[in-house]
Regions:
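Secretory-pathway lumenal glyco-enzymes, predominantly type II signal-anchor Golgi glycosyltransferases
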Residues: 1-324
């Protein structure tokens, strides 16, 4: 009697097919894992985490990289001990959407440290955020701090051929001085600057409040911008050095007047204004076209302002929290 070889042969074929199928599945899985790891590796090298030593910060907003981008430095003048205010403002500006076609760097500016706790805590902030500029001056409001800020910028950010590493020239088209009780809407700021000249420019909220003529007096210290060439002029000219004591915003207007500078002046009213309450000639209701809201001296005023502009609209749903 012949052995039944057809059944064994059929079993062998099925077994071989199963082995081949298993190998194909394993190969496909390995390929997927490899692709995932490769993508992860690319992500890790293309988007390194921010370093505390970087010149940009968590409060840096960039969109696009062409030569037409607007580069703005916002210097928020504050004091070394204002830790809570700085952390709060990092939230405010760090969660705003990037303005298309613009690069905005937000820095906190104050004078020399004077206490041991400042030397530790401010150093930790710099290591973590890299968004602090410490000027070589004694802390003050109207005794030369703003002059030191503007005149120091060309040395801090040389740009172009003067920079040790490749960088745009000028490093910023506009530099801004802002108060720490001012809320800035960055995208609206960029859109207001986009059609304007990038040299010999002075932009802000004209003082006195009823005035609409930017050539008569000066711009409010709530937040004003000058073009980079004017910061260089402030550094080099003798005019500011002879007139440094007094209200800083008024002094800047006098420097530019005496130096016959800032031929391009633009009034930011009424997109820049004081908080609606108490009502004065400098206030009006909050509105969507806002560039700056000033005199946010209390948390209640900040919250009312942030609620109006719906700053949490991009909060994503998650099982980790429930916010009504």
């Amino acid at each position: 009697m012949k052995p039944n070889t057809s059944g064994g042969r059929r079993y062998l074929i099925v077994f071989c097919f199963a082995v081949i199928l298993s190998l194909c599945v394993l190969a496909a899985i390995n390929e997927l894992e490899f692709d995932s790891l490769k993508k992860l590796g690319k992500c890790a090298f293309s988007n390194p985490p921010p370093s505390g030593n970087s010149s940009t910060t968590n409060a840096t907003f960039a969109a696009g990289g062409d030569d037409d981008e607007i580069r703005i430095l916002i210097g928020i003048l504050t004091r070394p001990d204002s830790y809570d205010k700085r952390h709060f403002l990092r939230l405010i500006y760090g969660t705003q959407s990037p303005a298309p076609g613009a690069r905005i760097d937000v820095k906190f500016v104050f004078c020399n440290l004077t206490k041991d706790d400042q030397r530790v805590l401010v150093a930790l902030e710099i290591m973590r955020y890299g968004d602090i500029i410490i000027l070589d001056c004694k802390e003050n409001m109207d005794n030369g701090k703003t002059y030191t800020y503007f005149s120091t910028l060309p040395e801090l950010f040389p740009g172009g051929d003067s920079s040790p590493s490749p960088s745009p020239s000028p490093p910023y088209h506009y530099v801004m001085k802002a108060d720490d009780d001012t809320y800035l809407r960055l995208e609206n700021l960029v859109e207001s600057l986009r059609p304007l000249p990038r040299k010999d420019l002075y932009f802000g909220y004209v003082i006195p409040c009823p005035s609409m003529d930017p050539f008569v007096h000066y711009m409010s210290g709530m937040g004003y911008l000058i073009s980079w060439d004017l910061a260089e002029w402030i550094r080099d000219s003798e005019i500011p050095k002879k007139n440094m004591v007094g209200p800083e915003d008024k002094l800047l207007g006098e420097w530019l007047r005496d130096g016959r500078r800032a031929k391009n002046r633009f009034n930011g009213k009424w997109s820049m204004y004081n908080f609606p309450e108490p009502a004065t000639q400098c206030t009006h209701e909050l509105w969507p076209e806002t560039i700056a809201v000033h005199l946010l001296k209390t948390q209640e005023k900040w919250i009312r302002t942030l609620e109006y502009f719906n700053v949490t609209v991009n909060l994503k749903p998650s099982k980790l929290y429930h916010i009504p």
